[in-house]
Amino acid sequence: MTVLLFGFEPFLEYKENPSQLIVEALNGSTILKEEVKGVILPVEYEKIEDLIVTKIREMKPILTLGIGVAPGRAKITPEKIAINYKYSREGDNAGKKYKGEKIDPLGQDGIFTNIPVEDLVDLLNENGIPAELSLSAGSYLCNNAMYIIIREARKYNSLGGFIHVPLHESYAARIQRPIPSMSLDTMIRGIRLSMEFILTNKKENLTFS
C-alpha cells in the first residue's frame, strides 16, 4: 500500500517552501512497509482539486497527508478541521482571489480529520518536537487542500489529514524581520514520526481496497 504526501510550491513572498522540501525528502521512503509517494501541488485554486482527486483515485493510499507552511507559527501544528470556505486577501500564484465562496457547493460546512491529532501532538512533544493542536487551517490553499483530501479519503475509507509546519531556519535567517522557524531536519523527523504513529494507530474498522 501507499502513503500519499502532498506539499506546496513557493508562493507570495516565500521563495522556498519547507512543505515542498519535506515531501521531496520523504518521497520514495518506506514507513512501516508502506511506500511514500510525494506530490508537489501548485499554489493555484483552479488546479489543486483535480490533482488531489486524481492522485487519490489512482493510488488509493492507506493515508493521505497534506503538508503546508504557516509563516508565523513556531511549532508543528496538526489540523483538526477543514472548512468549506475560500477567502484570500492575497491572490494565489495565478492571481486568483476568493471572497467567501465554497470549496464544494454540495459539501459539508466543515470536515474533521479521522487522524488522532490530539494524541499525535502529545507524541511529537514527547519526542522533543514542538507541536500543538490547530483548530484552523485558514482559508487559503492549505485549508482548500485539506478539505479535498479528507473528502476524498472518506470515499475510500482511508485516512486523511493535514499538518502545518513553520518556516525552515535557513530561509527564516534570510528574511529581514523576526519570524519563528524550525530546522528542516526536525520537521522531516516530525512528519516521519507522524506517519509512523498514524499508521500504527489506524482505526481497526477501516478497510482498504
Curated annotation (Swiss-Prot):
Q: Does the keyword Cytoplasm apply?
A: yes
- As recorded in Swiss-Prot or TrEMBL, the protein's gene is named pcp2
Any GO BP:
proteolysis
Enzyme Commission number(s) of this protein: 3.4.19.3
Q: Which GO terms describe its molecular function?
A: pyroglutamyl-peptidase activity
Matching entries from HAMAP family are given as: Pyrrolid_peptidase
Q: What does the UniProt record say this protein does?
A: Removes 5-oxoproline from various penultimate amino acid residues except L-proline.
Q: Which domain of life is it from?
A: Archaea
Please give the CDD domains that the UniProt record associates with this protein.
Peptidase_C15 (cd00501)
**Record key words, sorted:** Cytoplasm, Hydrolase, Protease, Thiol protease
Q: Which family does it belong to?
A: Belongs to the peptidase C15 family.
Listed name of the protein: Pyrrolidone-carboxylate peptidase 2
Q: Identify the species of origin.
A: Saccharolobus solfataricus (strain ATCC 35092 / DSM 1617 / JCM 11322 / P2)
| List of catalytic residues | E79, C142, H164
**Entry annotated with the keyword Protease:** yes
